[in-house]
Amino acid sequence: MKVGIMGGTGNIGEGLARRIXIGGKYDVMIKGRDKA
């Protein structure tokens, strides 16, 4: 989660989800892609 929030993996969807707020639901997908 730290890498996703502050790391900035270059995922535009991550930034948008975080701003909208829907980061919780997209967080799972982002985390899965980050590890993969």
UniProtKB/Swiss-Prot annotation:
Instruction: Tell me what reaction this enzyme catalyses.
Output: reduced coenzyme F420-(gamma-L-Glu)(n) + NADP(+) = oxidized coenzyme F420-(gamma-L-Glu)(n) + NADPH + 2 H(+)
**Chain sites annotated for binding NADP(+):** 9-12
Look up the EC number in the record and give it: 1.5.1.40
Q: Which InterPro entries match?
A: NAD(P)-bd_dom_sf
The broad enzyme category this protein falls into is oxidoreductase
Which superkingdom heads the taxonomic lineage of this protein's source? Archaea
Give the pH dependence of activity as annotated.
Optimum pH is 5.5 for F420 reduction with NADPH, and 9.2 for NADP(+) reduction with F420H(2).
Instruction: Name the coiled-coil region(s).
Output: none
One MF term in GO for this entry? Answer: 8-hydroxy-5-deazaflavin:NADPH oxidoreductase activity
Which keywords belong to this entry? NADP, Oxidoreductase
Q: How does activity depend on temperature?
A: Optimum temperature is 34 degrees Celsius.
The task this protein performs is described as:
Catalyzes the reduction of NADP(+) with F420H(2) via hydride transfer, and the reverse reaction, i.e. the reduction of F420 with NADPH. In M.organophilum, an alcohol-fermenting methanogen containing an NADP-dependent alcohol dehydrogenase, is probably involved in the regeneration of F420H(2) required for CO(2) reduction to methane. Thus, during growth on alcohol and CO(2), the F420-dependent NADP reductase probably has the function of coupling the NADP-dependent oxidation of the alcohol to the aldehyde with the F420-dependent reduction of CO(2) to methane.
Q: Describe its partners and assembly state.
A: Homotetramer.
Q: Which family does it belong to?
A: Belongs to the F420-dependent NADP reductase family.
Give the protein name, as stated in the record: F420-dependent NADP reductase
Q: Which organism is it from?
A: Methanogenium organophilum
What does the record give as the organism's lineage?
Archaea, Methanobacteriati, Methanobacteriota, Stenosarchaea group, Methanomicrobia
- UniProt lists the gene as fno
